Structure formats: C-alpha cells, structure tokens
C-alpha cells in the first residue's frame, strides 16, 4: 500500500479540515500513511473522517500544490506549529537569514548587515554598499528560517525594504525549540545542544556586533569583515538547529514508519579574511 517517502509532508493529514493530531495518529495506526493511501481507501468506513469528499479534495489539492510548488496552499492550511514538516520538501528554496542592527532607539535603529544562506551559498548584505541586493533572494524563497525572526528580523526587513511578502512560510526556531523544551537566545540554545562556535567568536554577541559596526563607521574596515563573519556563523547554525529540531519532532510524532532523518553534520567553510584581534580590543574598551 505505502510507497514510502523521505519527508514527512506526504504523510501529513493535519492540514485537512476536521483532522487534528489524535485523528491523524489514528489514521496512521490503521496503516493509512500517505496521501495515496487515503485516496485509495477513502470509502473505508473505519477511517475516522466525516466529510470524505472534502478529504478527497484536499488530498488532490495537496498533490497539485506539491507538483506546482505552491507553498501558499500549505501555508494557509497547515497549523503554524506544524510548518516544520514542510521544510525538507522545499529545502532548495529555503532562505536562512540573520539581521544585525546598529542598536539605536527604535525609530533610529536600522539594519547594518544581513547574512544569508540560500541555495548553498553564504552571502552578506551591507548597509551603504549592497543591502538592497538581498531583495531578489527574499522574493524568490519559499521558506525563511530565523531565530526570533518573527519579532525581530522579518519586521526590520519589511520596514527597511517595504516588502510585505506573504506567500512564504516563516520558521522561527525560537518557538520550535520552545516546543521541544528549550528556552533562551540563539547562543544559549547552541550551548545546550553542544554546538561549539570557533574560539575567536565564542565571546561575540549582539552588543559586540553593534560595536563592530561603530568601529567600521570610524574607518576600521576590518571590523566589517569580523561582523560579517559573526553574522554568517549565526546563519550557519540555523541550519544545524533546524535539522536537529526536525529530527526530534519526527521522533516525538511516533510515526509508524521511520522518516529519513536530516543530516546534522556539515562541512561548510565561511571564507572571509579577518583580523580577530579587534574583538579583544573591543572587550578591553567595554571593561574599562
């Protein structure tokens, strides 16, 4: 009956009206695991659904949306807390993103650097140089992954570029990890999971990023490269965290069949020439 799939999306029924978590699990326990299974067995009176025509139409719509890369269908119909299921199927159009700002009061606070990973390529976008070049990536992507981005990164991007992109899915890892029982900022979550940053970046935080931008503004050009490197470390670790979260949430579902786990190991190298001694300089200034 079941052909088997690498990702959880095609096993999901939770986006169909009338099917909640308990009902979805009952359906799985009956051996109805995929959209195809449901189509083939829709007349089975033991399947705990009430409107079979509605279920059938949603199965057909789901297949069509997947074939046509229509992320809007899944965005509108999946519960937000289940958006994580969608990621692997649209991985190639997923934008990992981190925003740094100048740290001023709200009306004066503006983006300084945006770091991204998209289609396997790390990039930096810098205020006063190429900041607006990030727009094509935002317009092309189908999923945006951030940490606390729903409250911070995305509002700043919308305000800065006057982009009100609606047809995408936002995966904010802060709330995904809260569901898994973790709390704290990005660096705190990394430490709790045993993700280690390079020694030269271990003591760098958001406040250091603000001071690096100030150094750059005072013509310390190396400070910009250090800031870019720090920002892209945030971006890189978003991928680790999302894959860890996906694998753990899959296990929590207790799905009857093993879902292929996402890789939690990467060998990325972020190539930016930096003199990290400026970090020690900043830390000494802060202490004094």
Regions found by a protein language model. Name each.
Residues 1-110, 116-288:
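DEDD superfamily 3′-5′ metal-dependent exonuclease/proofreading module
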């Amino acid at each position: 009956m079941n052909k088997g799939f690498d990702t959880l999306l095609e096993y999901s029924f939770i986006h169909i009206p009338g099917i909640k978590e308990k009902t979805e699990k009952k359906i799985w326990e009956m051996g109805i695991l995929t959209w195809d299974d449901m189509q083939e067995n829709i007349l089975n009176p033991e399947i705990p659904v009430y409107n079979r025509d509605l279920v059938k139409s949603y199965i057909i719509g789901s297949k069509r949306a997947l074939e046509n890369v229509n992320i809007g269908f899944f965005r509108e119909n999946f519960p937000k807390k289940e958006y994580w299921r969608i990621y692997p199927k649209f991985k190639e159009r997923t934008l990992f993103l981190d925003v740094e700002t100048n740290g001023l009061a709200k009306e004066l606070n503006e983006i300084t650097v945006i770091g991204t990973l998209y289609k396997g390529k790390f990039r930096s976008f810098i205020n006063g140089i190429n900041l607006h070049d990030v727009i094509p990536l935002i317009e092309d992507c189908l999923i945006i992954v951030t940490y606390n981005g729903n409250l911070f990164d995305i509002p700043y991007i919308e305000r800065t570029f006057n982009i009100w992109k609606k047809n995408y899915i936002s995966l904010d890892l802060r709330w995904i990890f809260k569901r898994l029982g973790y709390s704290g900022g990005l660096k705190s979550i990394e430490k709790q999971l045993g993700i280690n940053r390079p020694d030269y970046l271990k003591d760098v935080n958001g406040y250091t990023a603000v001071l690096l931008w100030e150094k750059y503004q005072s013509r310390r050009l190396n400070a910009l490269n250090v800031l870019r490197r720090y920002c892209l470390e945030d971006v890189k670790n978003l991928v680790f965290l999302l894959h860890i979260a996906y694998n753990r949430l899959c296990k929590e579902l207790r799905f009857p069949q093993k879902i292929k786990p996402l890789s939690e190991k990467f060998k990325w190298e972020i190539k930016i020439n930096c003199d990290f001694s400026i970090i020690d300089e900043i830390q000494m200034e802060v202490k004094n």
